Swiss-Prot record:
Residues 231-312 bind DNA. It comes from Sus scrofa (Pig). Keywords: Activator, DNA-binding, Homeobox, Nucleus, Phosphoprotein, Transcription, Transcription regulation. This is Hepatocyte nuclear factor 1-beta. It is found in: Nucleus. Residues 353-371 have a biased composition (Polar residues). GO terms for cellular component: nucleus. Residues 1-32 form the HNF-p1 domain. Residues 1-31 are annotated as: Dimerization. PANTHER family: HEPATOCYTE NUCLEAR FACTOR 1, HEPATOCYTE NUCLEAR FACTOR 1-BETA. Residues 328-371 are annotated as: Disordered. Residues 328-341 have a biased composition (Low complexity). It holds the Pfam family HNF-1B_C.
Length: 559
C-alpha cells in the first residue's frame, strides 16, 4: 500500500513515534481533534419526573456534545477570544418549551449546520440579518454571546466554540420560523388589526404593562430563571430600499403633506416586502420594521434639521477660514525674518517709496544693543530720498508693502495703515534725509557711540494708545557722550504710561524748541556719522525721551 503522506508528514510521524508516543495515544489524540458525526445538539425523550406517575411526561432534553469524551470545552482552535466560561445557552433552555416536533426539526437543522463549514453558515446568517434588518443586539440578547465576538465571527469568520455556534444556529432557525409565521399569519378583520396595532403601540411605549399581563404560571417561570436578561424592544431601523425611496421623495418635496406621506408608507412597505421575498399583501408580517406615517414624518423632520445644521456648520467653517486667513496674513506680514530682495530699490517688496531722481542708495545695516530684556538686532533699509517727493495724499508705504517693524514693546500694526504724511509737504524739495526704520532704543545706542555733540532733527512716528499717528519731529541738542551722562537706554518705572500723562510730560519740558519748517536745508558738520533719521517705534520707547535732563530736551508734537 502506497502511503499518501508527504515526506514532511512522514518525518513528523517518525519524530512523534521516536519521542515515545504510542499508536494508541496518537489515535486517541486524533479522535479528540477531529469532530465526530455526533457533534451538535441531540434530543432525547426522558421523563420529566421519574418518580411521579406511571405515564411519564416527555420533553426534549438537550445534550451538547463537545467531543468524544463530553468535555466542557474544545481545543484552542474553537476557543473564543474572551476565553470566558460559557454554560448552556439560555436559548437552548427556552427551546425545551416548544412542541416536540418543532424542537426535533430545529435540532436536526442545527445539527446539520454544525456539520457544515462555519464560515459558510456565518455568511448565510449575516445575509439573512441584512435582508430582514435584524440588529446584532437582538442576537446578543437572545443567545448571550459577546457582541464583539459575534461581529468578528459573522464578518471575518473568527473561530467560535461549537456550543456558541449551536446557540447562534438555534436562534437563526427559530427566527426563520418566527418570521415565516408572521408573514403567513392571517388577520380576521381590520378591527382586530387596529386593536392589535393599538395594543402593540401601548406595549411599545410602556413595556412594563407586558409583565402585568402575564399569568401567575408565567410569572413563576420568569422568576425561576433570573439569569435571563430582560429583552429590550427592537429599535426601528430603516432598510436600504425604504431609504432610497425617501431620499428621492425628499429631493422632490422637503415637507410632504399627509396624503403624500401615506403614499410613501405604502411604497416603502411594498419595497421592504420585496426585499424579503414575500408578497406586498403580507406587509403586516414586517413586525417592528413596518413603516408607518409617523415614522415617515419623523424622517423628513430629521432630514430638514440635519440640512439646516449642515448649512450653519458650512457658514461657521467659512467664517473661521476667513478669520484664519486674515490672521495668517497678518502674522506673515509681521514676521521679523524678512528676506531682502535683489530687485532694484524702487521695487523692494518690503518698503517702496515713490520718489524721483537718481540719488537712490540702498544699504543694509545691523544695529545691536543691550536693553533690559534682550539684545535687539534689526535689519534696516536705508534710502536717500527727497521728502518733497512724498505726496501728502499718499501713505508712507504702498498698500502692498509687506515689511513690519517689531520692537521690544510689542508688535506694531502693518505699516501700510499709517495715516497721511501731511507734515512733510512743507519741506524744501532739495532737503534730503536718511530714513532709518529701527526702534528708538537703537538710535540711542548709536548716539552714545558718537564722539561729538550735534543737533538732530528726527521725525518720529509716534504710537499713542496702541495706534500709529503721523510723523512727529524730535530735535536733539545735547552732548551725547558726556562721562557723567546716565545711559539713555535705562527704562524708567513709568515707561508704560498712558496717553494723558505722556502729553502732560511733553508740555512740561523746559526750553522746548518746536520744529519749524525751514526752506533751507540744515547744515551738519558730521553728516556721515549720524544723519537725520526717521524712527518707527512705539510709546514704550518714546517714553524714555521724557526722562532726559534739561540738556537732553526732546520736544514732541503728538496728535
Amino acid at each position: 500500500m502506497v502511503s499518501k503522506l508527504t515526506s514532511l508528514q512522514q518525518e513528523l510521524l517518525s519524530a512523534l513515534l521516536s519521542s515515545g508516543v504510542t499508536k494508541e495515544v496518537l489515535v486517541q489524540a486524533l479522535e479528540e481533534l477531529l469532530p465526530s458525526p455526533s457533534f451538535g445538539v441531540k434530543l432525547e425523550t426522558l421523563p420529566l419526573s421519574p418518580g411521579s406517575g406511571t405515564e411519564p411526561d416527555t420533553k426534549p432534553v438537550f445534550h451538547t456534545l463537545t467531543n468524544g469524551h463530553a468535555k466542557g470545552r474544545l481545543s484552542g482552535d474553537e476557543g473564543s477570544e474572551d476565553g470566558d466560561d460559557y454554560d448552556t445557552p439560555p436559548i437552548l433552555k427556552e427551546l425545551q418549551a416548544l412542541n416536540t416536533e418543532e424542537a426535533a426539526d430545529d435540532g436536526a437543522e442545527v445539527d446539520r449546520m454544525l456539520s457544515e463549514d462555519p464560515w459558510r453558515a456565518a455568511k448565510m446568517i449575516k445575509g439573512y440579518m441584512q435582508q430582514h434588518n435584524i440588529p446584532q443586539r437582538e442576537v446578543v440578547d437572545v443567545t448571550g454571546l459577546n457582541q464583539s465576538h459575534l461581529s468578528q465571527h459573522l464578518n471575518k469568520g473568527t473561530p467560535m466554540k461549537t456550543q456558541k455556534r449551536a446557540a447562534l444556529y438555534t436562534w437563526y432557525v427559530r427566527k426563520q420560523r418566527e418570521i415565516l409565521r408572521q408573514f403567513n399569519q392571517t388577520v380576521q378583520s381590520s378591527g382586530n388589526l387596529t386593536d392589535k396595532s393599538s395594543q402593540d403601540q401601548l406595549l411599545f411605549l410602556f413595556p412594563e404593562f407586558s409583565q402585568q399581563s402575564q399569568g401567575p404560571g408565567q410569572s413563576d417561570d420568569a422568576c425561576s430563571e433570573p439569569t435571563n436578561k430582560k429583552m429590550r424592544r427592537n429599535r426601528f431601523k430603516w432598510g436600504p430600499a425604504s431609504q432610497q425611496i425617501l431620499y428621492q421623495a425628499y429631493d422632490r418635496q422637503k415637507n410632504p403633506s399627509k396624503e403624500e406621506r401615506e403614499a410613501l408608507v405604502e411604497e416603502c412597505n411594498r419595497a421592504e416586502c420585496l426585499q424579503r421575498g414575500v408578497s406586498p399583501s403580507k406587509a403586516h408580517g414586517l413586525g417592528s420594521n413596518l413603516v408607518t406615517e409617523v415614522r415617515v414624518y419623523n424622517w423628513f423632520a430629521n432630514r430638514r434639521k440635519e440640512e439646516e445644521a449642515f448649512r450653519q456648520k458650512l457658514a461657521m467653517d467659512a467664517y473661521s477660514s476667513n478669520q484664519t486667513h486674515s490672521l495668517n496674513t497678518l502674522l506673515s506680514h509681521s514676521s521679523p525674518h524678512h528676506q531682502p530682495s535683489t530687485s532694484p530699490p524702487n521695487k523692494l517688496p518690503g518698503v517702496r517709496y515713490n520718489q524721483q531722481g537718481n540719488n537712490e542708495v540702498t544699504s543694509s545695516s545691523t544695529i545691536s544693543h543691550h536693553g533690559n530684556s534682550a539684545m535687539v538686532t534689526s535689519q534696516s533699509v536705508l534710502q536717500q530720498v527727497s521728502p518733497a517727493s512724498l505726496d501728502p495724499g499718499h501713505n508712507l508705504l504702498s498698500p502692498d508693502g509687506k515689511m513690519q517693524i517689531s520692537v521690544s514693546g510689542g508688535g506694531l500694526p502693518p505699516v501700510s495703515t499709517l495715516t497721511n504724511i501731511h507734515s512733510l509737504s512743507h519741506h524744501n524739495p532739495q532737503q534730503s534725509q536718511n530714513l532709518i526704520m529701527t526702534p528708538l532704543s537703537g538710535v540711542m545706542a548709536i548716539a552714545q557711540s558718537l564722539n561729538s555733540s550735534q543737533a538732530q532733527s528726527v521725525p518720529v512716528i509716534n504710537s499713542v494708545a496702541g495706534s500709529l499717528a503721523a510723523l512727529q519731529p524730535v530735535q536733539f541738542s545735547q552732548q551725547l557722550h558726556s562721562p557723567h551722562q546716565q545711559p539713555l537706554m535705562q527704562q524708567s518705572p513709568g515707561s508704560h504710561m498712558a496717553q494723558q500723562p505722556f502729553m502732560a510730560a511733553v508740555t512740561q519740558l523746559q526750553n522746548s524748541h518746536m520744529y519749524t519748517h525751514k526752506q533751507e536745508p540744515p547744515q551738519y558738520s558730521h553728516t556721515s556719522r549720524f544723519p537725520p533719521a526717521m524712527v518707527v517705534t512705539d510709546t514704550s520707547s518714546i517714553s524714555t525721551l521724557t526722562n532726559m535732563s534739561s540738556s537732553k530736551q526732546c520736544p514732541l508734537q503728538a496728535w
